[in-house]
Amino acid sequence: MPAASIVICTHNRAALLRRAVRGALGEAAAHDAEVLVVDNASADETPAILEALVREHGGRVRAVHEPELGLSAARNRGLAAAESPIVAYLDDEATPRPGWLAALLAPYRDSAVSCVGGRIVLRFEGTPPPWLVPPLDAALSAYDQGDRPRRLRYRPGDIYPFGANISFRVADAVAAGGFSTAVGPLGRRQLVHDETDLCFRLDVAGREIHYAPAAVVDHLVVAERLSPAWMLRRHYLGGVSGATFEIKNRGLWRALGKLRWYYRPRVTWERYVPREPVDTASLIRACARREALGYAAGLVRGTLRLRTLRREGPPHPIAPFPALHPDGVARP
């Protein structure tokens, strides 16, 4: 049995796939782990590249197919297909640094630990714009909770690990219901927080979420995301996602209360006019407004879907995965 399954979920990212797998292979070989790639309904050259990678790397690389479009469904497929007790998720844009997997696995010596995540450092195709500063960089998956390993809780000052660099004890994640398809990305609907949702359920069940600062990945940021328009859209969808998460896990009235106590003091109602050079302070305020607007829209959306969200609250089964063909690639 492998010590861990490094899971890379991908959808139509053939150009990035070889680099993503090569980056994971170095860590896998050092720790007797497998690399498991989940092809999430790709329509490009991804299946052919995966077959070649499986042939090239023997039993170290496996591939499975998830026909249901959506990152949450792909992550659940990774949970179901993993042949080890720990799954470590990487984005197909992420490359782990040496020692990443060892740092992620170390906290699992404590049986109370169900999730461990690490630091995410942004890397750019070109020169990043001068306006890209905290807190805006978090929208691009930058994540840093300091230099000290510690337990994370759902409380002010703590942020659960991000999905580009997160791991779970498989049995605990499955028992908690896996990743919710109500809050994760789906095609052009780039909602977030499916990993936050799973962490929250583990947390309230008394399981431990840990931060491992030595588990570092570099995350590539493509040029198309380095614009104020993309940043504004991302914050709007972050607000929608936040409202869905609150309604699903904490109830409608608490979700409504957060609009008042969290968003209202942070929002200044001024018009944002994009112009060059970009004024960083104005963009940060505009993103806060868009997030608040998205949260309000998410409350409406979540209220209309209240019964569905309530039904999804308890743990739900993870669908079985297809059998592997002799070449190591699973197909529907």
Language-model regions, residue ranges each:
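A conserved acidic beta->alpha catalytic loop
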Residues: 23, 39-48, 94
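Short, flexible, basic/aromatic active-site loop/helix in glycosyltransferases
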Residues: 118, 136-159
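Conserved donor NDP-sugar-binding/catalytic core segment of glycosyltransferases
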Residues: 99-132
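A short, conserved alpha-helix in the catalytic core of glycosyltransferases
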Residues: 163-168, 172-176, 182-215
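Glycine-rich, basic loop-to-helix element that forms the pyrophosphate-binding segment
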Residues: 66-82
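Non-catalytic, C-terminal membrane-associated alpha-helical segments of glycosyltransferases
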Residues: 233-240, 247-332
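Short aromatic/hydrophobic "clamp" motif used to bind/position activated sugar donors
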Residues: 87
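Short, acidic, metal-binding catalytic loop of nucleotide-sugar glycosyltransferases
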Residues: 22-32
